[in-house]
């Protein structure tokens, strides 16, 4: 897990239910008086069973969620998002922004003083697979660019 800007923005590779739960719990312990916002998605053409579980965990441990693309590969981003939504408590604030760069920029530029942000799922990765294209993408660079 990597921390940017004091304790406000965190980046982690968490891409399984247990890892997402652990990352959210860790950040909550570092930001006990803050609300917690999380950005995440799930990989396409991979374990579909974990999607609703990750949605449930996020809705139980975070105060708001932005769902976005991870590596959708050949799968429809909307289909992946629908699977995640099946586990989410409808009472929580949810945004769906499939473009990961836009999702990160939106979250970073609208982050309030009383919030912490977890950008989960890609961590150290430097590419994103969409369809048959492998694009250059890095969560940390996207977050830092949003701060400029």
Where does each model-flagged region fall?
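ATP-dependent carboxylate-amine ligase
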Residues: 2-148
């Amino acid at each position: 897990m990597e921390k940017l800007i004091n304790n406000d923005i965190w980046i982690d590779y968490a891409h399984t239910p247990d890892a997402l739960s652990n990352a959210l719990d860790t950040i909550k312990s570092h930001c006990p008086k803050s609300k917690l916002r999380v950005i995440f998605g799930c990989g396409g053409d991979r374990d579909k069973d974990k999607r609703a579980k990750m949605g449930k965990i996020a809705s139980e441990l975070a105060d708001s969620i932005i769902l976005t693309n991870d590596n959708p590969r050949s799968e429809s981003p909307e289909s992946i998002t629908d699977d995640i939504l099946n586990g989410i408590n409808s009472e929580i604030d949810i945004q769906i922004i499939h473009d990961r760069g836009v999702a990160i920029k939106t979250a970073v530029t609208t982050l309030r003083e009383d919030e912490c942000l977890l950008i989960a799922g890609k961590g150290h990765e430097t590419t994103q697979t969409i369809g048959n294209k492998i694009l250059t993408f890095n969560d940390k660079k996207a977050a830092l660019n949003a701060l400029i």
